[in-house]
């Protein structure tokens, strides 16, 4: 897997400003916002499937939107619009952090630590470690907050064989319902067969959330790139549905040879670990049990550009497992 590999591109992406969430025209519809397209100052109502997204989709923020007609999952929003419709959807939000001390004089760096190794030659000295980022630059992140985009990203990642925990795939389909009478009844993101003949099931989650201090981790240095990515968000409204899928996935794993995976598409690069949300102990417990029974966690980190291009970064982000 090569860092920097192209994954996909959102067609028609353009800059906008989020004027009001929820929309002033539809104040009771959480999935709609008022936005302004910056290139021509057009104002319109846009679909906002991420809702507030732990502060990443709030009034006043810069965002990236694209034309996106409604699909079958937007029926509730369309019904609330009383026959009207939307033409654009919010896909990414723009996060900027300014390093106010980047031009300050810096003290001299201490010498690098050294380690010794024995070889056929006389004892030699070998430098170890590498310089850590000093956060000299500002932090600018284009973060995919539309939960639907994680499925598109993962589909491309599967096709390009970007994940070590999932061998090359021979065939697969999206949104497959699996029923085992009295045991399992869930629709999973992907179901298919690997080239080694072993079936796999994957449930995909979108992870735009991150904090400097999360759970038991307290940061004082707050390097821009030391945040903890977490899932689910603080205001999660579908915990029961997600836990049911995790339990069903766990059941399938315990009763078959199927590769069962929980995938987390981390939509930003200013993080150094993934943790299951300290704001949702029910979800944490379900994940812990799943992992204990052999379900695998796949953390896929994606970097986005202003042009809506998704770039593969890594599938080896350290994961903090629940310890409840």
Predicted regions mapped to residue ranges:
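Active-site metal-binding core of divalent-cation-utilizing nuclease and nuclease-like domains
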Residues: 23, 97-103, 141-148, 163-217, ...
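Nucleic-acid nuclease catalytic cores
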Residues: 204, 210-211, 216-281, 301-303
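Structural detector for short beta-strands of small beta-barrel domains
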Residues: 8-23
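Acidic-basic catalytic patches of nuclease active cores, encompassing PD-(D/E)XK
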Residues: 102-129, 133-181
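Beta-strand/loop nucleic-acid-binding surfaces
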Residues: 41-56
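Short, charged beta-turn/beta-strand-edge "cap" motif at the junction between a beta-strand
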Residues: 22-24, 50, 66-79
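Domain-level recognition of nuclease-like catalytic cores that cleave nucleotide substrates
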Residues: 268-324
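Short aromatic-glycine-enriched beta-strand elements
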Residues: 24-34
């Amino acid at each position: 897997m090569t860092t920097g590999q192209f994954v996909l591109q959102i067609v028609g992406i353009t800059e906008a400003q989020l004027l009001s969430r929820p929309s002033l025209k539809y104040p009771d519809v959480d999935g709609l916002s008022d936005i302004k397209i910056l290139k021509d100052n057009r104002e319109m109502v846009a679909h906002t499937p991420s809702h507030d997204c732990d502060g990443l989709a709030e009034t006043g923020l810069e965002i990236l939107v694209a034309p996106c007609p409604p699909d079958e999952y937007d029926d509730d929003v369309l019904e609330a619009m009383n026959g009207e419709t939307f033409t654009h959807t919010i896909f990414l939000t723009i996060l900027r952090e300014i390093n106010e001390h980047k031009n300050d004089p810096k003290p001299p760096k201490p010498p690098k630590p050294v380690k010794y190794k024995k070889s056929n030659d006389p004892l030699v000295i070998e430098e170890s470690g590498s310089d850590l980022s000093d956060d000299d630059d500002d932090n600018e992140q284009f973060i995919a907050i539309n939960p639907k985009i994680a499925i598109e990203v993962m589909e491309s990642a599967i096709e390009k064989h970007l994940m070590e925990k999932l061998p090359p795939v021979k065939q697969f389909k999206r949104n497959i319902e699996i029923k085992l009478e009295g045991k399992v009844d869930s629709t999973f993101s992907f179901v298919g067969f690997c080239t080694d003949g072993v079936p796999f099931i994957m449930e995909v989650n979108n992870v735009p959330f991150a904090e400097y201090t999360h759970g038991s981790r307290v940061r004082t240095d707050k390097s821009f790139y030391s945040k903890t990515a977490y899932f689910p968000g603080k205001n999660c409204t579908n915990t029961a549905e997600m836990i049911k899928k995790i339990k069903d996935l766990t059941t399938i794993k315990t009763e078959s040879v199927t590769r069962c995976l929980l995938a987390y598409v981390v939509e930003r690069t200013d993080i150094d670990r993934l943790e299951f949300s300290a704001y949702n102990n029910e979800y944490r417990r379900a994940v812990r049990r799943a992992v204990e029974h052999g379900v695998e966690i796949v953390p896929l980190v994606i970097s986005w550009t202003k042009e809506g291009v998704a770039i593969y970064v890594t599938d080896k982000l350290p994961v903090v497992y629940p310890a409840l």
